[in-house]
Design a protein with these regions (language model features):
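N-terminal Rossmann NAD(P)H-binding glycine-rich loop of SDR-like oxidoreductase domains
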Residues: 14, 22
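Short, small/polar-rich loop/turn modules that mediate ligand/substrate recognition or access, typified
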Residues: 160-164, 221-223
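Active-site loop-to-helix junction immediately N-terminal to the catalytic Tyr of the SDR YXXXK motif
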Residues: 86, 134-142, 154
């Protein structure tokens, strides 16, 4: 549901995909609370409110809005190392940010998730194409995001019909997390060549899909992982 009575809670909404989503929602929402460690480039005006928060920290999470129609968890990690090079701390950090942070976020949100006008509330999580596609150097993040997908499906069953919950599984999206991978024209061209659509993803690509999953247009979609990967996972050209 997207409209003048809607309230959204976006974790990690001050950078990358989360920031782009906040910009897309800002013109049509009553309130958008953004939980993140810093405001960064966040446009704190109109319905947008920044609440300092570290979802992986020791402190209790802030009190969420009284009624939430849409919640999105954007924090993630890009920790591309060989299995041999990964330490247990690497696995633990990826697990804490991707899964346990999402668990804490969802536990805070659940009592406040309320649909309007007969529509369920909607939750969007982020996975990665590397869960379904075996990729080298992705074992830690793929393990953590695979757990996110399992969590999402379980909660989709548990929370229906009052709440829908889905996940987006992107391939490479041009965000600050991957800036070193796209730091030269040559690197960008090489990355783009891996995809049937011959470009890397943009924050607008991912945010637009998240916005769709928050809207009534996706009202019969729950428990799904939606690929956003330029055709990588299904197309061979």
């Amino acid at each position: 549901m997207i409209g003048p009575v809607t309230t959204y809670l976006v974790a990690g909404g001050s950078r990358g995909i989360g920031l782009e989503l906040v910009r897309m929602l800002a013109g049509s929402a009553a309130r958008i609370d953004v939980w993140s460690r810093s405001a960064d480039a966040l446009p704190i005006e109109g319905p947008v409110r920044h609440v300092p928060c570290d979802v992986t920290g020791p402190d209790p999470l802030p009190d969420p809005p009284e009624s939430i129609q849409g919640a999105v968890y954007c924090p993630g990690t890009v920790n591309l190392k060989s299995f041999r090079a990964l330490s247990e701390d690497d696995f633990r950090r990826d697990w804490e940010v991707n899964l346990l942070g999402a668990v804490r976020f969802l536990k805070a949100c659940q009592p406040r998730l309320k649909g309007v006008d007969g529509e369920p509330a909607s939750v969007v999580l982020f996975s990665t194409v590397a869960v379904a596609q075996g990729m080298p150097m992705h074992s830690s993040v793929a393990a953590a995001k695979g757990a996110v997908e399992g969590l999402m499906r379980s909660l989709a069953a548990e929370w229906a019909p009052k709440v829908r919950i889905n996940a987006i599984a992107p391939a490479l999206v041009d965000t600050p997390l991957v800036e070193r991978m796209l730091s030269t024209p040559e690197k960008r061209e090489a990355m783009a060549a891996r995809y049937p659509l011959k470009r890397v993803g943009t924050t607008s690509d991912a945010a637009a899909l998240a916005r769709f999953l928050l809207s009534p247009e996706s009202g019969w979609i729950t428990g799904q992982v939606l690929g956003l990967d330029g055709g990588m996972s299904t197309v061979r050209v």
